[in-house]
């Protein structure tokens, strides 16, 4: 789920 994590970073949810 590397993509999912990356998307989180882009969305600003993955701090």
From Swiss-Prot:
Keyword Repressor: no
GO biological process, one term: proton transmembrane transport
Keyword Transport: yes
EC number(s) on file: 7.1.2.2
Keywords associated with the record: ATP synthesis, ATP-binding, CF(1), Hydrogen ion transport, Ion transport, Membrane, Mitochondrion, Mitochondrion inner membrane, Nucleotide-binding, Translocase, Transport
Highest taxon of the lineage: Eukaryota
GO cellular component: mitochondrial inner membrane; proton-transporting ATP synthase complex
Molecular function, one GO term: ATP binding
Class in the EC hierarchy, top level: translocase
Compartments where found: Mitochondrion; Mitochondrion inner membrane
Reaction(s) the record says it catalyses: ATP + H2O + 4 H(+)(in) = ADP + phosphate + 5 H(+)(out)
Main location, first listed in the record: mitochondrion
Signal peptide bounds: none
Function: Mitochondrial membrane ATP synthase (F(1)F(0) ATP synthase or Complex V) produces ATP from ADP in the presence of a proton gradient across the membrane which is generated by electron transport complexes of the respiratory chain. F-type ATPases consist of two structural domains, F(1) - containing the extramembraneous catalytic core, and F(0) - containing the membrane proton channel, linked together by a central stalk and a peripheral stalk. During catalysis, ATP synthesis in the catalytic domain of F(1) is coupled via a rotary mechanism of the central stalk subunits to proton translocation.
Protein family: Belongs to the ATPase alpha/beta chains family.
Other facts noted in the record for this chain: On the 2D-gel the determined pI of this protein (spot N153) is: 5.5, its MW is: 55 kDa.
Description of how the protein assembles with itself and partners: F-type ATPases have 2 components, CF(1) - the catalytic core - and CF(0) - the membrane proton channel. CF(1) has five subunits: alpha(3), beta(3), gamma(1), delta(1), epsilon(1). CF(0) has three main subunits: a, b and c.
Name of this chain's protein: ATP synthase subunit beta, mitochondrial
Native organism: Pinus pinaster (Maritime pine)
